[in-house]
Amino acid sequence: MAESPAFLSAQDVGSFAYLTIKDRTPQILTKVIDTLHRHKSEFFEKHGEEGVEAEKKAISLLSKLRNELQTDKPIIPLVDKCVDTDIWNQYLEYQRSLLNEGDGEPRWFFSPWLFVECYMYRRIHEAIMQSPPIHDFDVFKESKDENFFESQDSINALCTHLLQLKPITDLGEKQIQDEFFKLLQISLWGNKCDLSLSGGESSSQKADIINSLKDLKPFILVNETESLWALLSKLKKTAEPPAVRVDIVLDNSGFELVTDLVFADFLLSSELATEIHFHGKIIPWFVSDVTVRDFEWIVEHMKGSHLESMSACGAAWEAYVGMKKWVYHDHAFWTLPHPFCAMPQVAPDLYAELQKAGVVLFKGDLNYRKLMGDRKWKFTVPFHQALSGFHPAPLCSIRTLKCELQVGLQPGQAEHLTASDPHWLTTGKYGIFQFDGPL
């Protein structure tokens, strides 16, 4: 097999990876420090002087981290005692082993971008963990919750649309298929709401996304949703016993999570699936990623909404969780720096879990980077090849483009895009559905 290309890294001055490490990550760290400052009185109320001291300690550790990053210091081992600490430090050793003699140590602007960016979020977690009694404070909670509240109109419109379709089994197959594609596209464009891309600034969904779908269609660069529909339709007819499990590896909380839950509800209600398994992060991650607290918080706030459609959806979703038709999982692997092709070795239990699915949907850009190994693949390399052997089950990536990595395009397609829109890879304006079917 041909050798895999080099990793994306901030060594390439002017690249998106370089600008992320140079500008966006320090901006995110500054915002985290500011968040801690603003909660000082809350920490004092809850924990007295000890809470204030903890806040000072966390800020001091985060300021040190920001300085290390901005001055391109060597990457240092983690010192906390978490379930993943040893795996992280082994991975740092592995990165060190890849360097040539004159390269020195792994560094922020030199080592693979995926590694150093994940490492930064893991160090944020370490700083909080080392500062009891505020060690369970989610520094990103505020911005995630804000995104949900600012997107109320869009969420309500989406829930109203879903409820108007019910009972979905009464619809004809063609209408179910049309709605399947529509709700998939809504889940795709929900992925635009990414707080790590906006440096933690507001990125809520205020427009009515349902009525925008027609205008957004030309921005889907690869659309393999027909293959996904064909697979689910076939599974529905042939599954023995009649059980179809769909797994969704989540990305952002807030509006995007609601679009994923609406799609999951549709899959159950249309009997295209009998159970949905969601996969989230065990720690706050990449500003807006879903943790179990976010998942439960969204369902609870939907149910408690004064808006009827939202409240009805929230109640239905709570019931799905209660009946185990919706199951939430988290696993330390999702917040490691490893590409997904390493999952069978690093997290065989998680790989075995995904193998139980009829299909696995991977939401968002970070999951795409990990699926592709965050390498400088040519634009025309087939999606299956770039997965480097990762195939626990048929899978589909649903992602808006937010980094300089894209495979599976037609010859000339990337060049045409570059000519018309030089930043097409990084703005979240374009999207893809890429499918890797049954082997």
From Swiss-Prot:
GO terms for biological process: DNA damage response; methylation. Substrate binds at residues 251-252, 365-369, 402. Mn(2+) binds at residues 251-252, 289. Disulfide bonds: none annotated. It catalyses: beta-D-fructose 1-phosphate + H2O = D-fructose + phosphate; beta-D-fructose 6-phosphate = dihydroxyacetone + D-glyceraldehyde 3-phosphate; L-glutamyl-[protein] + S-adenosyl-L-methionine = [protein]-L-glutamate 5-O-methyl ester + S-adenosyl-L-homocysteine. It holds the Pfam family ARMT1-like_dom. Its cofactor is Mn(2+); Ni(2+). Keywords: Acetylation, DNA damage, Hydrolase, Manganese, Metal-binding, Methyltransferase, Nickel, Phosphoprotein, S-adenosyl-L-methionine, Transferase. S-adenosyl-L-methionine binds at residues 256, 289. Its EC number is 3.1.3.-, 2.1.1.-. Belongs to the damage-control phosphatase family. Sugar phosphate phosphatase III subfamily. Subfamily III proteins have a conserved RTxK motif about 40-50 residues from the C-terminus; the threonine may be replaced by serine or cysteine. This is Damage-control phosphatase ARMT1. It comes from Rattus norvegicus (Rat). The gene is Armt1.
